[in-house]
Amino acid sequence: MKISVIGAGYVGLVSGACLADVGNDVVCLDVDHRKIDTLNSGGIPIHEPGLDAIVKRNVVAGRLRFTTDIETAVAHGVLQFIAVGTPPDEDGSADLQYVVAAARNIGRHMQDYKVVVDKSTVPVGTADKVRLALAEELAARGAAIPYSVVSNPEFLKEGAAIEDFMKPDRIVIGADDARAIELMRELYAPFQRNRERLLTMDIKSAELTKYAANAMLATRISFMNELANLADTLGADIELVRQGIGSDPRIGFHFLYPGIGYGGSCFPKDVQALIRTATDAGQPLQVLQAVEAANHAQKSILPRKIVQRLGADLGGKTIALWGLAFKPNTDDMREAPSRVLIEDLLQRGARVCAYDPVATAEAKRIYADEPRIAFAANPMAALDGADALAIVTEWKEFRSPDFAAMRARLKNPLIFDGRNLYNPATPRQAGLEYHAIGRP
């Protein structure tokens, strides 16, 4: 099947590459010439495990191409996936200008039937705006060309996006006409050979499903973080509590790990957008408002623990950081807890020496003008002469360190673990002072 993907960012590039990998003929469009030049020269502009190999394989096979030419992309595919950004506006609502612009470009250039598929995360009612933009552009041309609009939200986890796309737990299709549904069913047939994963529903329900899923996961994170803070106060161990409640099959263990808050490109933005959608509809989501407030506060937990132990004035002190990305297996630092911690430490006069296996280049871009941040080549090098270590991201390589070596390299044998990676007894037996989240 011929497919066009408008937007060669995270969602668009992963979707286009995976669809090409099962035999489709895919063209990815982006208005960013540098991004397309990078892709056409064999580079990958984002870090995602497995993406480089799948892109190169399908480019070589001739099934995946990249362009900045809108007319070429619109002419190519019967399926036109819109996978552009929907950044938060000042009021928290999703900014749909890029989605609507993509729809208008399709309307200006289409010559035959198209299925326009919203792949971007968008609020309820966006399909109506897409449909209106298409209709206006066709009317301006005096063209009577049929089209369908479909909602097909993505459920990709950064760091596991290829696996999520190739082996989905569900495929949500929101559509109101049989022709579009049949084309989408044909498209996704290779991804559901073992069992039926395709859920068809009306468009508004599909649009809400994506936001609802992310909001539910964010709620679990904030709830566990709140419980961890209570455990800190009461002297309970949140790890034992987690095991006790997670063993209940009605609850389970997914997203039940306390820490220092969620970040990234999805949860913060989508929670804010759903809160705004609900408020505009006259049905405010009080629970979700609390979730967002709790997450914002949780990002200050690690700075607070450091200040309680070392004092408010950190001038002359160096804090080592393990982890910069908002989660493992990505270089994404958007809304990352590390940024809150770094900014607090710098304001208090500290120096920072950070290590991250993937996100260092992104951190150097963000903090290019900050001379008090240094970057280490490996985890242990970050510890040399540091007054404390703060663990911010739960990369696997941090899970089994040599605690004796850590103690020897730290100026002050002090660890603040924002991800509860260790049994507290283990670093303490090595002579390290260890502070975690909700653990005595």
PLM regions and their residue ranges:
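Structural/interface elements that position substrates and couple domains in central-metabolism enzymes
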Residues: M1-P440
